[in-house]
Every structure is written in C-alpha cells, then in structure tokens.
From Swiss-Prot:
This is Uncharacterized protein C211.03. It is a single-pass membrane protein. Gene3D superfamilies: 1.10.220.20, Arf Nucleotide-binding Site Opener,domain 2. Disulfide bonds: none annotated. GO terms for biological process: actin cytoskeleton organization; endoplasmic reticulum to Golgi vesicle-mediated transport; Golgi to plasma membrane protein transport; regulation of ARF protein signal transduction; signaling.
Amino acid sequence: MEVPRASPNQEPLCSISPSSLVINEIITVVTAIRKTTRWRNSGVASILGVSTLKDEFLADGLESRWKTNGEKSSSIRYPLVMEFSQLKEDLTNRASLNGYDSLKLLSPFLRTIKSPRMTGYITSLCLSAILKFFSFRIISEESPNLALSMRNLSFAITQCRFESFDASQDEAVLLRVSRLMEELLRGPGKAVLSDDSICEIVETGLSMCCQSRLSQVLRYSAELSMTSILEKIFERLKYIDVKTDSEDFWDASEEHSIKGEEFHYKKITEGDEISNEIDPFGIGSIREVFRVLVSFIDFGKQKFSDNIKAMALRFINTALEVSGSHISDFPSLRVLITDTLCKSLLQLIRSDHTALLTNSLLVMTTLLQAMPGSLKLQQELFISYLISCLHIPSTTPRERNVETSLHKVVSSLDLSEEISPDRATPTSFTERKRFAFDTRNRPPEVRELIVECLGSLSRIPYFLIDLYVNYDCDPQMSDLAIDLLKVLTRNCLVDSARYSTANVPPLCLDALLNFIYYFHEHLQPCYNDPNNTFKDDVAKTLIESKKRKAIIIEGAELFNESPSDGIAFLTQHSIIKQSDNPTCIVEFFHSTNRLSKRVLGEFLTKGSNSHILNAFISAFDFKGKRIDEALRLLLQSFRLPGESQLIERVLETFSHYYMSANPDSMSSKDAAFVLSYSIIMLNTDQHNPNIKSQRRMTLDDFCRNVRGVNDGQDFDRNFLSEIYKAIKENEIIVAEEHDTELSFLYIWSKLQQSVKITEPFKRSSSNVHDKIVFLEVWKSIMAALIYVFSTATEDTVFYRVVNGIQQATEVAAAYELNEPVDYAIERFCQFTALDPSSVPGTQLNTAIKVEDRIITVSELSVRFGRDFRAQLALLVLFWISSKFGNIIDASWPLLVQLTICLARNNLIDNSFLPGFKLFGYQWFPFPEPPLNSGKPALSKEGGLLSALSSYLSSYANDEPPCPTDEEIQHTLCTIDCISSAKIDNFLTKLVDLKQPGLNKLLDSLLSLSNPSTSLLTDENTVDDNKVSSVEALSNIQSAIVADLLTSLFLGTRESLNKLERRTQILSYLLFQIEQSGDEKVINQLSLYIFEMFMDDDLKLSENSEDWGLFSKLCNLLNDKNIVVRNQSLSLFHQLVNKYPFLLESWIGLQLVQSAVNTNTADIDDLYRLLSKIPTNLLDLPMFQVYLGCVDTLIQTIVKQIAQILSKQKKGASKGLPFDKSILDNHSAELNDAFNLFLKAAVEYKVDSNESSEHFQDTRWKIIYDHVCKLCLSRSRSLRAASLSCLQRIVVEQLDQPHEVSYTMALFHLVLLPTMENMITVLTEKPEHKIFGLAQAQMFNIICKTVLIDMNVLSAQKEMLHTLWLKLMDVAIKLSSIHGSESMAEVMESIKNVFMILHGAGALAGPTIEVDPEIPDHLIKTWNTTWNNLFIYYPELSNDLNINNEAEMKKENLKNPSQTTTV
C-alpha cells in the first residue's frame, strides 16, 4: 500500500501529533527543572499535573481541609512548574493545535527564559523547544495572537537571564539565543515584529558579537546570525513607502541625534503593559539600526577595536547588498550614507589593518554600485585616493622583448608626481593623499587590496564610461577615467610587483580586460539607445565639454604663472565673458578650484585689483555667521599674503561686507576690522610651532587686545571666549596646504556644501557614450595589453590578452575607427618578426622533401617555428586583418610586406593569392631554392667532426648545408601556423573589400613602386655581396603586388575611378617589367596586363591612352626577348577576339612574332593567333613578318616531331609500344601551319596588270620563297608538307586571272630554280638517294603547273618550247642521278606534258617530214627531245606511241577543223 506523501504546505511538518510533541518538550523542561536543587521538592503536581474536583464534591472549606499539613499548594510555591503542568493538561486532550493561542503556548517557556534563577541548561532547553515549534510550523502565520506572542518572545530572548555555572553551557545558551533571533526574522514573526523589537534584537545581537569574553567561535556564529537578521531587516526597504521618511529627520536633539552608538527606542521593562496593537517594523527601526552600525566605524572614536569595526563594516555591507539602490530612496538614510558613512570610510581606508581596510573598500565598492547617483563627489575623493596609493614613482623599465616605439607609448602613460603645495586642485598624487591626511607609502599588501577593489569596480558595466562622462568631461572634476587607466596600465606591467605583490599585475590586467569586455558587450543591440537619433548630439556635447575643460585647465595653469595672461586667455575662449568686468572674473574664481591659492591671494591684494577684491568678497554669504566663522570661510579660498599692508586691505574689505550682512553684530566696521585682525593674530599665535606653549596668548590677553574697540565698549566676554576657543581648537588654514585631520574635515565640509550645487551623477543605461569614451581610452589600454603580450611567459596571460585585443578591435571596427585596428596590426607585425627590418636573407634557403611534399627550410622558418609568441601574434594578426579589412587604413603596407616575406621564403604558394582563384593560373614566380637530396644533418647526436664534415661537403657541392631534424620540425611548425592563420582566406577575400578600404589598399600597393628600397629599410638587411638577393626580393614583391592590384581592380564589385586606377596599375606593371630582368616575373606581370585589357569596361582603340600602354608592353616583350607563356597567349587570343584590329597593327604583329620566336610549347595558341591575322590588310613589311612567324612555327613543330621520333626510337629499343597518335597530332599541326601559307595566298588578290618584272616584288614571290626554302629541308615530313603546300599555292595562284608572263615568271623565278636547288643541294648530301622522291614530287608539281595553265601558255608557243627544253633538261639530270628505272614518276610526268604539248601543236613529233610548213625551231625542239630525252627514257618512246601519233598528225593536217586544243 502506497503511503501518501505530505504536501510541503501542510501544517505542521512533524510526523507525530503536534500536541504530543509540545508535551514532550514540556516534560523535558520540567524534568530538568525538578532535577535542580531549588526545584527538587516541587511535588507530584509537576508530574501529575493540576486537576480540580467536580462541583458535587465541593463544599465550603472542604478543599482547604484536604491540603497536606497546612502547607501552601505547589501551584503557589512553584508557579512556573505548575504553569507547565497546566499547559500539559490543556494539551493532553487536543488532537490538533490549529487555532491554539500562540501566546498561551509560549508563555511558560518565555517565563523560564527570563527567569534569572534557572540554569543555563534549562534555558537552553526552552530555547530549543521554541526553535522546534517554529521549525515544525506548530507556530505559523495563522496562529492566533501571533503579533503579541512575537513581541513577548523578542522581549524574552533579549532579556534572557540565567544562572551561570559552566562557560561552555552559557555559550550554548547564547548560541541558541542568536539562532532564535534569526528565526524570528526569518520565520512567521518577520511581518509582525515592531520597531522596538527589531532594535532590541539587533542590540542583543551586536552585544553578543562585541563581547570579547565570549569565545571566538560563538562570536563568529553570532555574526552569522546577525548577518541573516540584517538581511531580513533591510530587505524590508523594498516594500516600505518612501513617503514615510524625511530628510530633516536628523536634528541636534538626543532622540534624533545622528551620533552615538546607543539605540534610541522605547525600551520595555518587566512591569510594563504590552499593547495588543502592534505595528510592523518600518523605516524607524531600519534607520536606527543603520545609524548604530555606522557609529561603530566612526574614525574619531577609539572605543571599538579594529576587529569590531571590521565586523560592523561587514554588517553595513550586508545591508547595502540587500537593499541595493532602494536605500538611496529614503532621504534620512541617504544623508547618513553620503555624510557620516562616507566620511568614516574615506578615513578608514588609510588603515593598514587588513580586515579593516578590506571591508572598508568592500563597503565603498558596494556603495558605488548601489547608489552612485548620490555619491558623485565622494566617489571622486575615493577613487582619487586609490589612484594616488597605486602610483609608482619610477619610470617604466625597458624590457628585452619590447619594441622601442611601444615602450615610448607605455612610458607616456606614467603619471608624474606634481608637487605643488599651493594648488587647490587635487591633480597631483601628493595632494590626492591629503584628502585622507595620509602621506605614507602603502605596504604591498595594501596595494593589492586596493587593486582588488578597483577590479571589483571595473566589473560594473558602465563604470569607466560613467567616470569619463561625469568627471573627465566636467571642468570642476578630476580626470578620473584617464588617471585610473594610467595607473592600472602602469601597475599591470611585470615590474610593478617590486612595489606591491606578484598578484597586482594580473589584477590590474584583469581590470583593463573588464573595461574592454564591457565595451564589447555594449555592442549588442539590447544596449542601443532607443533615442539613437540623439547619439550624435550627445557625443558633440561631451566633446565640447571636454574641450572646455581643457581650456579651463590651460587657462588656470597660465593664470598660476601669469594672472594677466591667464585672464586674457580665458577671455579669448569665452570662459570669462568680459575681462573688464570684475563680476565675470570673480565668477570664474569661485567656479574653479584649479587656481593657486598663493597666486590668487597675491592677485586679489594688489592695489590695482581692489575692484576685483571687492567683487570677490561680496560673493560670500556672511549672514548669520560669527565673525571668526566668516573670516575662516573667506581665508579658505586664498592664501593671505604676509605683508601687513595687504592684510589690512583684505580685512577692510571683509569688514565692510561682513557688517553689511550682519549690521547688529557690532557697532561699526572699524570694530569688525580690529577684531578680524586680532583673530588672525590669535590664529598665528596659537598654532605657530616656534612659540612655546607657556608664551601663547590666553583668553585674557585676547580680550585685552580688543578692549574698547567696539565703539568705545568692550565685546562680550562670552562672545570673545567662543571665538578664542574656536581658533584654539581649529586653526584657520588653507586645507590643501596641510596634511592633518583638520584639513580633511574642512575639505569634507566643503564637499558637503558642494553637493547641492554639483550636477547629479549621470548613470549610463545604453551605449550612447561608448564611442567617445573608447576613442579616448583605447590607446592606453591596448598599449598595456600589447606590452604585457611582449613580456608574458604564461599561456593564460597570452590568451587573456589576445582575447582582450580581439574584443578591442571588434569595438573599434563597430565604431569605424581605423587607428586602433592599425595599431594592433602594426604591433603584431613586429611580434611576428616578419617585418622588413628583421627578415634574414635567403641565401641559405634550401628545399627538402619531407614525406610527400617539398618544403623550404630557411633561417626565417626556423626562427619563427621556435617563437611561440610570434606564432600567436601571426594568428591574431590575420584574424584581425581578415575580420576588419574594411577598417584597415595605414597598416596595409605592413600586411603586404609580411606576405612578400612569406612568399620570399616559400612559406606560401600561389593558391594563397587572389589571382589564383580569379585568373586560374597554375604557376607563380616564387623563388626556387636548390633541392637538397641529402639526409638531414645531425642536430644533437653526433660529434663535432661529423657535423663539420657535413657542413663542408655541402659547400663543396655548391649547395646550402642540409637542414637538421630540429630545423625541419621548426619549419613544419611554421607551415602549420601559417595554415592555421588562414592567410589564403585573407588574401583571396581582399576583392570583397568595401570603400574606402579598397582605395586605401590600392594606394598602399601603388606606393610600393620601388621594391628594392620599400622592403629593405634597414641598411643592415642588405649585403653588398648579395645583390641577387635584392633582385629576388624585388621580383617577388613586384609579382605579388601586381597580383593584388590586378585582382582588386578586376575582382571588386565596388565603384572605382576605373580610368584613373587602370592607368595607375598598368603604369606600375609596365614599370616593373621595365625594371625586371627575370623572364618569369616579366611573364607573370604581362599576364596581369593582358587581364587588365580584358576588362569589359575597357574600350581599346588606337587613339586611346591605353593603346600606348599596350604598345609599350609589346615593345618591352620584344626588346627583352621574353618567352610568352601559354596563359598569356590565351589571353592575347581573347583580346584579339575582342579587338580584331590588334592583329592589323604593327604592335600586335610584333607581339605575335615575339611569341612565335620564343614559345616552343603552345602550338595551338600560336596557330590560332596566326590564323586570325588578315594578311590582305598587312603592308609588305608586316606581311614578311607574318610569313616569318609561320616559318618559325613550322620549324618548331618539326623539332617537336623529331624529338618524338627520337624518344619513340629509344622506347622501341627497350620494347616499349609505339604511340602513333602523338605523331599524328603533330603531323596535323604541321599541315595546319602550312595552311597559313595557303591562307595568305588565298587572301592575296593578284593585280592582273602586274608584269612579270614585278613578280619578285610581289607577295607571291615572298610566299614562294618561304615555302620553297622549306622544300629543301632534310626532314621528310617537312619536305612532304612543303611540297604539298607549294602545289596548293600554285593552284590557287593560277586559278586567278593572270598573264602568261606571270606564269612564266612563276616557272623561271620559283619552280625551276627550286628544282635546280633541290638537285644541287640534295645531291651534294651523302644520303642524296633518299631525296629522290622529293625531287620527283617537285618535278611533278612543275609538270602539273604546265598542264594546269596550258590555256594561257598555248598562246605563247615559243615560251612553251623553252619551258619544255628546261623540263627535259631537269628530267635528264634526275635520270642521270637516280637512273631511269627509279624515276618512273618523273617519266610519267614528262610523258603527260609531252602529250599535252604535242597534242596542242606546241611540240612537233615524228611526222615533221610530212608537213614542210613546220618551223625550224619545232624541228629543232623535237630533235633535241628525241636525241636526249628518249635516250635517258627509252621506255618513253614506246609509251608515247610515236608512229600512231604521226598518223594522227597527218589526219589533222588534212582536216584542220578537227584540230584538238587544250
């Protein structure tokens, strides 16, 4: 069966019957009472209880006769015991105590507690029983008569009396008393206790805490209970109506006095009647409790020890923590805090007692967090003193790892000691300490406590911002925010531990990081001001206020040196409205405390400034003040000069205005003058340390000095006695010139007077002021953080500092502030040691294969891999740069130079650069260090001789020494760090920069126009014997800058002045090409130029400025004979598609020529370029260049074919398969190249009027010369392609209209000379027999040419005869060389020609005897043919069928109409 669980809200909580539980407690207490000697004979009634007879058994006098021995009843002799018995009897028959009277239930227990005849043990039992009643909710909020029972209970426990026998038992009683008081406030009584009860409870609790005779454990326990009690008391402030309190509550009466540690409340004695109507406690008791707590820490009273004061401070802190800002809503409590409490705290913080100082600082910190709006002046005084205590007199030392410029920045933040004994403004540390009349150097432990206090304040979200807004921008206040930052900055440096403890630097660092954290936190949208439109107005107001303050400070300093100059300066800046108006001048004197008291006194007492003196004194309110009080008020504002004449001048004016304010105080102003002078003399007499006490002026002496000056009468002696006493006890001083308690009290009174006229403390609730404050403080904070970074040795410090710097840069970026981001980048660049001034040379760089990759080991990579600080700096550097690229301004050159340094040492590759993704190139002109194939040198193992041997052998092989394993590991660490830094992401995302950051980067890149000096700023970095190193640096810089410039220009989507930027970038690139001698770099730069000209926004024309730049590029490439790479060729090809006129220009053709002459790999690109050239539009010189390019292209292809054949031949000898496809591809390329000759022939139109004499000057002749020259090549493939091309060109030419002379010129100037050259040149070679086919092909071409152009040649038969004889001569020569049997193709060709000529009648045959009309030359031609040709080619006669031919001829002669023509 499941047992039902009790609900937590059920009453009571005990599992047994509540009546039984109470009865058990009664039995326990009564049993303990019976066992005592005094109560041992209490009788059976204490056991059986009290019962009465029923009515029917009672009779008059019967009951009295039943009493034993005539003794008194036990109820009379032992009423306390009988009361317990009566309660037990009453509860015996009750199953539940709901609705039972709580006062009746507690009454016997309370009487026992108050009884002085009870032992401590019995009292302790009663207290425990009551505690149990509350714990088990036997007494709860619903109990009847609860308020009265709680009032009686509080009275009982505060009046607890018992017989003391055992000290430990006594303390147990007190422990339970304190526990029960705590339960009263925490339990059901918290809502019904009266003001008097609260005061009684707190008074009792404080008494227990302060009794030194009690054990330390009991006092600690009582303190814990008091802490809990005070929490509940001051929690009530949240629910009390503020209107129940009044600021005028405190008066001079004893009842409402703000002084004294005694409680002021109506105390109830044993015989007093307690009213049934009780009001719950409220502001009255809370105010009284707080007043007593404050009185415990009164600095002027030495009644309490430091430990008691420390305890009171803890109680006060508890009250402030619980009540929070609500406590400032009550005027009387606010007065108590702002005056009495703060004055005591500001005096206690000078203590060296650890507990007292700790708790004083804690209370002040809690106050500033709970109610800063009411403590503006007190907060200034407090923080100023703390700053002065943390001042380090020495300058910042120079650490080994700290860069000079950084050290200068940090050193500039040191606060100098400004000792100016006559200045009223608390600007120097000495003067700040005087506010607490403390000129000692605080111990190290005290400095640590002060830093911890400032650290707590730094965790207030708007603390620094509120300081700046309320103090730094207030002309009358100190620069608390700036000074606080300076002192924290100075103390966060490691050397400050010499003046304090080792914990101070990290504590100060933590405070600075807190400030940065809250700046960063306020960037969240929830902190935005809903009235964001007024943010600019607020910022403008703050800036103007800060400027005004600076002017006032400068004017005051100038006044202290020269009053006239100071007034003129202040008038010029409208601080003093009119310099000739004494009222305006005096208003300034009274409005600032920055003037020197001495200088002001000298200025006012000058005779020429009497009108200003009158205006100055008239501004004081002397009404109702005694003359010494008025004089004290006046002389606090300036130092009275020592000359009697000047003193008299001041006192005469003072007397006049004093009598005007107090006409009834004395008879005349002369009397006031004499009395004032006497008071000054009395003040000097009483407080001059050089006068012995026996010779000091007495009251009688003072009265005698002023006898009869009051219009012939004496002043009242009591009046003079009060003056004498006031002067004797309190010297008239200028407070800032003394270090006494009196000076502090004066300054404090002056502060209280200034509270009413001081602007209220402005507490921030949004980030409206953050930007202005951050702009003012960022440099000091970041300088400190970076300084710590440079000297830190622990990982935690590194990471905290880095996190702080990251947050600071995020804040700067959010407010679009360039300088903080640039500052961080500049410093971290220095930490990486990759800046130009510290980069080592690259002469010893060596490449080595590690696993499956090749790495470059350099001095830079090894050094960087060893330096953890440098690696972390690199990570942070590129985190900042990547995230806030749009904010970077002046640090772009550093980032570019760092990238160049990495590239120079092969620590990044082309994939890092934006051009890699944007342009798709696969190669970049990085340095190529020698590849070291040896094993790593010994690093730690191995002897000196082996290491030396390895070193020398490496130089003998003309290579750097092989790197050690350790160096390789450091290099790998460097590579990993660079990869983690994500430099590639940073560089590739540069194209996404917004304006104006994009223009700033472009300007920075263009400024690096002289690479030989831009990176080598340190003379020591350049070795005169290593000029090549400088050139290498120049080359890599040029290439990287060019990549960035081109990528930014072409990859950005931002608006640019494209015309201007394009010209700048192209000019830069051309300049670098002109200066560079490295072909790889020039190629890469030319690639970028081609990319620039491919821009869609560029409209290139021959009259534009860009055309001149393009022409310059082409000229440079030609002049330097640069091998143009394939990607550049592809871009040029695209450019040609976009601007076809490029190939019609001499510039474009020159570029093509340069590419053809130098490039040996990109045949397709070259062919496409050449094929696009419109040869018909080229003039003759350009045409010659074009054909030369085709010729060179053909030669290149032939060389490649030869190389392939050679490789395949070698492969065949090794049994490797023959790849015919490669050879076929190149053969196709060769045919395509020859087609370019044909293309030129096709596009060229022959002038039909052109004579044969001009043939050699025509383009035909140029084309034939190139093709025929190639026909003489020893390469079979080249000869075959050349002959094929030649034949097609001939056909193409003859297909166009022409004269016979043109044809004959073709034969005699081109074909036949070529044939002769082939016979002559090729026959001379040893392997001439293998060229027979080529000669036969050439002869075949000539014969075909005759046949093709027979229609033209037939008209000039004489020319045909000559041509035939020449052909016959060639055929004979070929037969003599190769034999007729091997020249079948020649014989076939000559036969065809013969038949055509013979058939056309151009050549006579064997029938010439038949026709006597045939000319002699035909007969001669035939005879020559018969006698020569048929001798060498006898088969030819049979093939030609001469006899049949003769018969046919005869028939033709008979029938001329049937003559056949060709």
